[in-house]
Amino acid sequence: MNILGMKLFAHHKGGGSTANGRNSAGRRLGAKAGDGQEIHAGSIIYRQRGTKIHPGKNVGQGGDDTLFALVNGVVKFERLGKYKKQVSVYPAEEAK
């Protein structure tokens, strides 16, 4: 049927679907304390998945690989050989 140049159809084809359209929020990983920063015992230094940075002196590692300070002091990021990095916390009087 053709009325004034328009075609009328009995049905309209479906629009279909897509597999895209989702995204997850970022996990807020990374450094939470900088090199040379004074922190308290129990403070989170670095959030990570796996051991991207290894725990050094006075630093503990949580079940999710988060690094945290065991003592009050100053944060120090250091190289551990050619390819690895570690973070240590030195007591304030020892760091000066």
Swiss-Prot record:
Region (Disordered): 13-33
One MF annotation (Gene Ontology) recorded for this entry: structural constituent of ribosome
Keywords carried by this UniProt record: Ribonucleoprotein, Ribosomal protein
PROSITE patterns in the record: RIBOSOMAL_L27
UniProt GO BP: translation
CC terms in the record's Gene Ontology section: cytosolic large ribosomal subunit
One Pfam family in the UniProt entry: Ribosomal_L27
Family: Belongs to the bacterial ribosomal protein bL27 family.
Name of the protein described by the UniProt record: Large ribosomal subunit protein bL27
Organism: Lactobacillus acidophilus (strain ATCC 700396 / NCK56 / N2 / NCFM)
Source taxonomy: Bacteria, Bacillati, Bacillota, Bacilli, Lactobacillales
